Amino acid sequence: MKNKVILITAFIGIFFTSCSKFLDQVPDDVLSEEDIFESLVNTRKYLAQVYTNMPDEFSCRFAPSNYAGPYTGASDEANYWSLSWVMSNSLNQSTWDNTAGGTFWINWYKPVRTATDFINKIDGANDAEVDDMIKKHYKGEARAMRAIFYFWMMRLYGPVIILDKEVPVNGTGDEIFFARTPFDECVDYVVGQLDSAYAEITESVQNTSQHADQPLTYSNVVEYGRVTTGVCKAYKLQVLMLAASPQFNGNTQLANLKNQDGTQLVNQTYDAGKWTKAVNAAKEFLEEFDGTTYSLYKETDTDSWVAAYKSCKNVIVTDWNTEWIFGRPMSTTSDYWYDITPKLVGYSSDVAKGAGFLSVNQSMVDAYEMKNGLRITNSLSGYSSSGFSDFKSPYDLKARSTFNQWVNREARFYVGVTYNRSYWQNQAGSTEVIPVFEYSGNSGKVQSSWDVTSTGYIVRKQLATTGYSSRGWVYLRLAQIYLDYAEALNEVDPGNTDILKYVNLIRVRAGLPGYGSGDSDIEAPTTQSTVREVIRHERQIELAFENVRYFDLRRWLIAEETMGANVYGMNVYADGDDFYEKTLTYNRRFLQRDYLWPVPNDEILKDKYLVQNPGW
């Protein structure tokens, strides 16, 4: 922890617009504390500082810079293996240290402290400039963002230090030294703060033209990316899901995680009631917002498979659509765009080129189902692991020779994965653009020792047709809420019809048959454990490459067998038929200590009460 709270030394201006300038950082003049709440402009700028440390996940290659996380490349979904300096690679080898791992602990306490100061002082703002509606709404936003930053830290570090009051700027001794707060108390605090923020935002807009479930409108512009009542309820569910899951619900592997006075920081007894709290939170959200404020994003087409593809693709790249609950607008997505665009050597200059080194792991490719809704391990699925067929993907203009592993897969596969010799989405000019990942191909190893895919696949999901211009990154969307509800309900009331109902809503949107007993259904799982596996599988596919899988595997305590598994892909050192051989890309390891990130060692040395996570 820092020994001081700096109230304000400089502002970071935020232009809250529906475009890409939402979190543009513009240094302003140094202002005194009295100046901050004297005008609406300065008050907005100070609130903007709370939002500023939200992660720019388009910069995940450079994590932890820009507060981006290494989560996609550090999960079993994908990798940046060809780039030795990328943070996810040290996680994948468990060679990282508490310097890199502690970055978010330091960076996210900054907005926590700013939010606390804002909450304590906003009521004294100049009434002539900042009316009561704005005061209460902004206070609710700051309170919710403080809770969300705590949640983001909790899913990395476990028990954190809850600072509900300001730390004196010139404090000493026990005024600035703190022990970690037991995890269940962290959960109760965050839930309580989100409930309070929900109430404040709701009350603030009464008798106004604003709506609590919509972002504020300022100067006739909707300020997307701001906290709403829906955001409060959705993150309440997220923290309760984390608390109910095996990682923090009776996890005896953390029995030795205690404060210096012996206080147990993670409960050692399983509590089924935590799942009930998650179920109730999910119901609260769905009853208030589902079908009104939010709905599953869907597009149409004469071909139902193409409609499914368009729906599953554009729910991610169509900013602020009906499914988005919370996200961050960005002025550029160039880093990520470069990561998922092939090298394409030899094409004219009007063809946009990248590297394509955010590589999909073969295990992720294999997880996608077939078009008929069966897994590739099912003998009735029609899957073939060898040979070629003339096949037209849902985004292609014609049929072309395609490796049979990639033929007739579910629509979400074509949303998520760019494979060898597939039709490139962003065409230019009259020459057809086709990426070739074989060794001698236009995007193969011969072109670069590191600036190409390591597995013969590239992540495709965030690929937009607008290049790398301003776009939003969605943190949380309705499909995840559906799956959260199904998961929690299966732990509380196995066999409840709502469980597969909400799973099936997502599957049908993806063009797949649902689980059931009808002629067109997939046979439904019948036990709690098999339903649990179905839900986890659906989360893996639906939420792929959205920074969800990394945290799921940890909270389920199965990261050692998944994130620690070796990575396979195609043979990127071969051409022709030899390319299509499943080949070991590299070995991974995941140690027990990696379930929790390390607290920065400097903070341990400064704070006499602060204890480190096990194994660090």
Task: Identify what each model region corresponds to.
Residues S39, R44-F62, Y80-G158, G173-S219, ...:
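Conserved, well-structured interaction surfaces
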Residues R146-A147, K236-L240, G472-P513:
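Extended amphipathic alpha-helical segments enriched in small hydrophobics
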Residues V187, W275, G495-N496:
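TPR-repeat structural position
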Residues C19, W108-P111, Y189-V191, N220-E223, ...:
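Long, intrinsically disordered, low-complexity segments
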Residues N3, G13-S39, V190, A486, ...:
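Bacterial Sec-dependent N-terminal signal peptides
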